[in-house]
Design a protein with these regions (language model features):
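Short secondary-structure transition/capping segments
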Residues: 65-68, 95-97, 118-122, 186-190
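Hydrophobic, well-structured mid-protein blocks that either form specific transmembrane helices
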Residues: 93-139
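Conserved N-terminal beta1-alpha1 strand-loop-helix module at the mouth
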Residues: 2-81, 89-93, 97, 128-133, ...
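Glycine- and other small-residue-rich loops at beta-strand/loop junctions that grip anionic moieties
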Residues: 64, 84-88, 108-111, 158, ...
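Hydrophobic positions in alpha-helices of CheY-like receiver
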Residues: 75, 79, 122, 126, ...
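Conserved beta-strand positions in the central sheet of alpha/beta enzyme cores
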Residues: 54-55, 106-108, 132, 156-157, ...
Length: 197
């Protein structure tokens, strides 16, 4: 079935990423340089034909987390495109707040020990279609294959090198995060992947 989907190469989604720290857009999880006005940036994404924005909440405490959720809510009020968010999710209430803030889906972090149990509860309460998982290694998928299929609607792959293994381990759809945009590299990698299917 994935080969059929890949053959519809005209179907592409362009997904932007946004990192929030203290209610402001920053360059990355490791670079806290402010990127300008977060609302203008999201409006630019909205007006540029981006299909979805994935927001990473980089908060380290509850007050900052609330500030970032408030920012996400304001973003969702002012743009038309879909928003998914994750980061600092420690309770079912955090999932609820992000969904109520207008997020289409909530992203859980596979590297966090409590994520699977919490995601399972969130999936049961809010629906599997609202729950995503960010992953960066194949071991997690191998160890939790059945739970992934049952709990998560989609995977956010943070390491492009695991795609081949991912194809053999799960039928769960995925989005690949690419920290740098190089259209030639992306095209070559996807052509190679399609040929393998």
């Amino acid at each position: 079935p994935r080969k059929e989907v890949c053959n519809l190469i005209g179907f592409k989604n362009i997904v932007a990423t946004l990192y929030l720290k203290n209610g402001q857009a920053v360059k990355s999880a490791s670079d806290m340089t402010v990127m300008g006005d977060v609302y203008n940036l999201c409006q630019l994404y909205n007006d540029s034909g981006i299909d979805k924005i994935i927001i990473f909440d980089l908060s380290t405490d509850d007050d900052e987390h609330e500030k970032n959720i408030h920012t996400i809510e304001n973003i969702n009020r002012n743009i038309d495109i879909k928003v998914c968010a994750g980061g600092n999710i420690n309770r079912i209430e955090d999932v609820k707040k992000l969904l109520y803030a207008g997020c289409l889906q909530v992203i859980f972090n596979a590297t966090k020990d409590s994520s699977l149990e919490l995601a399972n509860a969130a999936s049961e309460k809010f629906g599997k279609d609202k729950i995503l998982l960010s992953i960066s290694n194949v071991d997690y998928i191998f160890k939790h294959q059945e739970e992934i299929e049952d709990t998560f609607h989609e995977l956010l792959v943070l390491n492009i090198d695991i795609i081949d293994a991912l194809e053999n381990l799960t039928s769960t759809p995925y989005v690949v995060y690419m920290p740098q945009f190089d259209i030639d590299k992306i095209t070559t990698q996807w052509k190679d992947l399609i040929e393998k299917l």
